[in-house]
Amino acid sequence: MVISCGATDKAMMARCIELSRVAARKGEYPFGTVIALNGQIVAEAINSTIRDGDVTRHAEIIALSRAQKTAGRERLRRYTLYSNIEPCAMCAYCIREAWVSRVVYALGSPVMGGLSKWNILRDDGLSHRIPEIFGAVPEVVSGILLQEAQQAWRDWSPLAWEMIKLRGLLTAPCAQAGHIHVQPEHSRSLRHYLHVLFLRSGQLRSRIGRPLEHLSDL
């Protein structure tokens, strides 16, 4: 994995983080994506899974669709996709099928990530065995504006962010699997917790000092 950055990458990632904050204000989870060509934004998007009631409406998927329409073609060679969070497996397959040349993200996703967990972004077998469908392995740049990306999630819900960190769901991209703190399964899913935490954010502000065991009382 390549870990480097320039002024353009930082500017584009700053926009992704800004979009993630917009998503949070609109009642979505804080994900934002930008697609650029030669340093110019071609498309951008936020998650709309809650608004649309559609689990496939990830920011990366929406941005890819918009970029393809703007470009007038399916394949996005020489384009860069930026996201505040490492794309999931679903989004990673779409990135490969769209032939995106470069992927840049801030926070890694070791449990669900299309690179760190499932290796889709680095799997050259896709393009070797099905070259008619999948593009070459993209360059991957990670860790851009890491602290700023973390702060956006922390601002969205401090208590949810603490739980996410404890479960090792979003981490610095270089973290090794052995360093991820795996939490035992709970009776209710992470999706349920995040949804409840978001809906009750006003109540949570007064509970931040309480132990995490009190999540079961929500």
Task: Please tell me what each predicted stretch does.
Residues F31-G39:
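Short beta-strand scaffold segments in enzyme catalytic cores
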Residues C16, S20-A23, T33, A43, ...:
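Small-residue (primarily alanine) positions within well-ordered alpha-helices
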Residues V42-T49:
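Short beta->alpha transition motifs characteristic of CBS
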Residues T49, S83, L107:
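Residues that line or immediately flank small-molecule/substrate-binding pockets and catalytic motifs
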